[in-house]
Amino acid sequence: MKTIAIIFDPAHGKDVKGKCSPDGRHKEYLWSRDRINNLVPRLKSLGYDVYVTTDSDNEPGLSYRKKFATQLKTENRKLLISLHNNAAGSGLSWMSAQGVEVYTTPGVTDADVCSDIILRQFKKDFPEFKMRFYKDSYLERDKEASFTVLMGSGYMGVLIEWLFQDNKDDVIFLADLKINRKFENSLVESIEQINEHFKS
């Protein structure tokens, strides 16, 4: 019996400018939706109720995403996972920043527990990637921001910034099918651990 319902939130729509690599090869909207399209059936097969804030390739608006998660009716505790790629610049030039970040809202909440589980699993599965922790200690590994999609009520929200789409090396990783499958596996394992945590 699963105790949490998963709400996936895909990255910015394809009609939002600048959400790609400087050479245009990598598209954040597509990477995010491809991951979610693979994750949804896997998690459903494990017994989870899984939802997606939008099935459009275009941008529905940040408030729409938040409203979807807030108003979703389910008997289970809700966990929203927003999947993004990071960027250090405006998207016009290659930059040097690399690695992985996870964001929650300001303050310590149950979302911090979720983000800590996710980040520890990422660190285990991807020792070659830089984990950009706020501080490498329990419930402080995530970074905090008042991102609209995280600010709704009645759900735990985490926003994953998976690698930098304006770093040449990270873009190679983002295009690697094996790494993408490994990312999906790592996130599924994290969700299983989160589910177990909130059973008690």
In which residue ranges do the predicted regions lie?
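Active-site histidine-acidic residue metal-binding/catalytic motifs
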Residues: 1-66, 96-98
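Loop/turn elements at helix/coil->beta-strand transitions in domains of secreted/extracellular proteins
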Residues: 2-4, 43-50, 74-80, 128-129, ...
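Active-site-adjacent mobile loop/cap segments within catalytic or ligand-binding domains
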Residues: 7-9, 20, 26, 72, ...
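Solvent-exposed loop/turn segments at secondary-structure junctions
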Residues: 13-15, 56-60, 85-91, 107-110, ...
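A short, glycine/acidic-enriched catalytic loop
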Residues: 15-27, 87-117, 121, 125
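Long, well-ordered alpha-helical scaffolding segments within enzyme catalytic domains
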Residues: 34-40, 44, 113-128, 172-200
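A structural preference for short, hydrophobic beta-strand core positions in alpha/beta folds
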Residues: 52, 133-136
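Short, well-structured alpha-helical segments in soluble
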Residues: 65-75
